[in-house]
Amino acid sequence: MNGLNQLQKYIKEQELTGVVLIDPINLHYFAGFTGTTGFAIVTQDKAFMITDFRYTEQATKQCEGYEVIQYETSVMDTLVDIFNDNHIHNGLFGIEGKYMPVDTYETLCDTLDERFNFTSINFAKLRAVKREDELELMRKAAKIGDDAFAALLPQLKVGMTENDARIILESEMLKRGSEEPSFATIVASGNRSSMPHGVASDKIIEDGDFITFDFGAVYKGFHSDMTRTVVMGPASEQQKNLYSIVLEAQKRGVAAVRAGITGKELDAVCRDYIRERGYTKEFNHGTGHGVGLEIHEEPVANPKSDTVFSENMIITVEPGIYLSGEIGLRIEDSVIVKADGCELLTHSPKELIEIGI
């Protein structure tokens, strides 16, 4: 089942007249469109992609099952023409309430008068369970990240900056087919490792530093996400102790992933283990999130998440400990939820790596 079939099945199940899409992520997922200007109308049995001259040919090639319509001056006028030409005169349409700007919504309402009602749909939930073709692309993205990280490790040297390491890592991903980094690459060393999202800086990497790398590749639009923490030279007893706690919590989290578990149940597996070893406030972010066409998607694993995981969802498992201004670390894998467990997407070694030893 492709994105369009999935969406039309949903429209019928929800007894909607149709949906209106403008979010580039949803246009990619449900139509295959990767241009920057598009507007899709999908009904129970028809689909239209509205775009301008720059993307008409592209949309014709990408948007299987859609009638591609080029607008000249006004998207809204073209929308009205589509409705009139196809005898769509009233009904209930789903819109992207979390994405659609207020002015666009108001224009949509004004343009269509009072003929239609609108309801907000969380399309991210529709994208949460991945199709097999998506999973294959995500396996490829994850492998790019794994291979790039393996290529980085022998190049790490005391005296280089975090940005030097970032450039090497991102270059290795690009060499292997990544379109771009999944997000601003995190390289946090020494006392900066206590910052969960410490993006790479010009800090010099020193002997004895923990270095946390949180990064990902993008392959055909799909993201990977992985975190590993290494130490420059021999690890101290404190580093070994903290690392062993986080590693065990992370392994327990991965082992707990399965269809039927909730986000807060998974979170508790990691959080309780860390708390029982004396660290509560030092682990103060969620345990995981979904990944796909966006780096942060449904589902989530945090203390408040009642989301029940389904087979073929993606979830990260990424506990950490952060001692403010001193030291920190995180270990993260992305996994595919299965009926009785999970499939690892990321395979880089998780035992503590001492660089240069």
At which residue positions do the language-model features occur?
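Active-site neighborhoods and metal-handling regions in enzymes and metal-associated proteins
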Residues: 1-357
